[in-house]
């Protein structure tokens, strides 16, 4: 299972680097395009998260992998 987590982490890092890398001479991405990419990445991270909690409008992931029914993350502190 550790290899799968490592593979997913490397894939997301490569995807993130590819989407935001700008070669010299290229025009910057439009705001709409950047917002769409950010939304897709956030959606992927939420799908991979097994313990997603929101507190006072701030949502955070508290664990990747493992059982969704039995999260092993620490409790949310204020």
Swiss-Prot record:
Record's keyword terms, sorted: Antimicrobial, Fungicide, Plant defense, Secreted, Signal
Tree of life domain: Eukaryota
Subcellular location, principal: secreted
Listed name of the protein: Putative defensin-like protein 288
Record has Disulfide bond as a keyword: no
GO biological-process terms attached to the record: defense response to fungus; killing of cells of another organism
Stated family: Belongs to the DEFL family.
GO cellular component term of the entry, any: extracellular region
Signal peptide positions on this chain: 1-21
Annotated compartments: Secreted
């Amino acid at each position: 299972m550790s290899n799968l987590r490592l593979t997913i982490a490397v894939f997301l890092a490569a995807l993130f680097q590819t989407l935001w890398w700008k070669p010299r001479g290229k025009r910057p991405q439009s705001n709409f395009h950047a917002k769409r990419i950010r939304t897709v990445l956030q959606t992927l991270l939420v799908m991979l998260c097994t313990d997603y909690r929101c507190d006072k409008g701030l949502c955070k992931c508290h664990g990747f992998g493992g059982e969704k029914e039995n999260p092993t993350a620490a409790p949310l502190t204020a």
